[in-house]
Swiss-Prot record:
It is found in: Cytoplasm. GO terms for cellular component: cytoplasm. This is Phosphoribosyl-ATP pyrophosphatase. Pathway: Amino-acid biosynthesis; L-histidine biosynthesis; L-histidine from 5-phospho-alpha-D-ribose 1-diphosphate: step 2/9. NCBIfam families: histidine_hisI, PRK00400.1-3. One of its GO terms (molecular function) is phosphoribosyl-ATP diphosphatase activity. Belongs to the PRA-PH family. Pfam families: PRA-PH. GO terms for biological process: L-histidine biosynthetic process. The keyword Cytoplasm applies.
Amino acid sequence: MTQSTEDTLLRLAAVIDSRKGGDPEQSYVSRLFHKGDDAVLKKIGEEATEVVLAAKDVRQGGAPTALVGEVADLWFHCLVMLSHFDLSPADVIAELERREGLSGIEEKALRKRREREANGG
């Protein structure tokens, strides 16, 4: 990720954060925040489904730009969700950096071991 890309994510996250106390009649993001957890999480599900459908369309000759647009929608709504739960893109980036260099199998085994240890096992 380039510094410019990270800056874009952080700028967008700052705008989203600024909408937390905003007027739900004036801002889509403020409206989602105002509606609460279920509305934010439902939107993530809807956007994820649209990504899957767009990806399938690309395999059948659909426009790759449609997939990019749907992924952008999903990422945006994931940023809204992170903000809603008082998290930031930096938290996700830190987790990705922590996982970097680990195989998926190795990372999953470490996660399961940590879960067992946390549960007293």
